[in-house]
Design a protein with these regions (language model features):
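Short, catalytically relevant binding-site loops at active-site mouths
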Residues: 119-121, 151-154
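Non-catalytic alpha-helical scaffold/packing segments enriched in small hydrophobic residues
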Residues: 124-131, 144-147, 173
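Short, solvent-exposed loop/turn segments at secondary-structure junctions
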Residues: 23-25, 152-153
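Non-transmembrane, aqueous-exposed alpha-helical and coiled segments at domain scale
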Residues: 26, 130-139, 143
Length: 239
């Protein structure tokens, strides 16, 4: 993550579009945060906390682009009924990447946070990624895209999801797909493999596939299994 932080600083985006598996879940819909800010802290670690502005202009444009692509999506907020003044709780899938990628800057980088829709077809996530990229291209600002995506969660028998040999099987396939620039191939994953390995990544990676198309070159930085789940860091640069 420190290397991704270095590269993000070098690219110096004005705002980050972040795809999180751990934000709000809306049945049958993708979700785009349209509150004025996001704030939160890690459980039991109150000193790891962030409060960042939402790029509401880009968030609104992203939502419109999803609608234009006929993808079911809703804008979501929290608390106050004036979206500009509302503060959306920040999930850990958002906080941890932002901790490294500009959330602690002064001022912090603004964000647009999008949640996938696991109950929608996998192929629709590719189309959603393309719509998100279209909105970013039209925005006139420098945008970085972050796919927050832990890998398989069944590496340890004492973990919350138990042990499955399919964890390594899935992650090996994902690593190859990322490294070879074939993220779209994940649309053909066996649902049983996904269920047994329990990744939090497939949906955001397919959105990343739609956003990057064939014009971005991947580079794997690291893959580790520090606990019961796998963690993959990769960076993309344009050809």
């Amino acid at each position: 993550m420190l290397e991704l932080d270095r590269r993000c600083d070098a690219a110096d985006p004005d705002t980050l579009v972040l795809l999180t598996p751990h934000g709000i879940h809306v049945e049958g819909h993708f979700a785009v945060v349209v509150a004025g800010r996001m704030a939160g802290a890690l459980d039991d670690t109150p000193n790891v906390a962030l409060d960042v502005p939402v790029d509401r202009g880009l968030a609104t444009a992203t939502l419109a682009a999803l609608h234009d692509a006929e993808i079911p999506a809703v804008g979501v907020s929290f608390g106050g009924n004036v979206p500009e003044d509302a503060v959306m709780p920040m999930d850990w899938g958002t906080l941890i990447p932002l901790w490294y990628l500009g959330g602690r800057r002064d001022p912090p980088r603004s964000v647009v946070v999008v949640a996938p829709a696991r109950d929608r077809p996998l192929a629709e996530h590719i189309a959603a990624g393309a719509a998100i990229a279209s909105a970013a291209h039209r925005s006139g600002v420098r945008v970085g895209l972050v796919a927050s995506a832990d890998q398989a969660h069944t590496y340890r028998s004492d973990g919350p999801y138990g042990l499955s040999p399919r964890a390594a099987e899935l992650d090996e396939r994902i690593i190859r797909a990322v490294g070879e620039g074939r993220l779209q191939s994940l649309v053909d994953l066996d649902p049983t493999l996904v269920e047994e390995a329990k990744p939090d990544s497939v949906w955001q990676l397919l959105m990343l596939a739609g956003a990057t198309g064939e014009t971005w070159r991947p580079e794997i930085i690291s893959f580790e299994v520090p606990t019961y789940f796998g963690m993959l860091c990769a960076a993309y640069s344009q050809h």
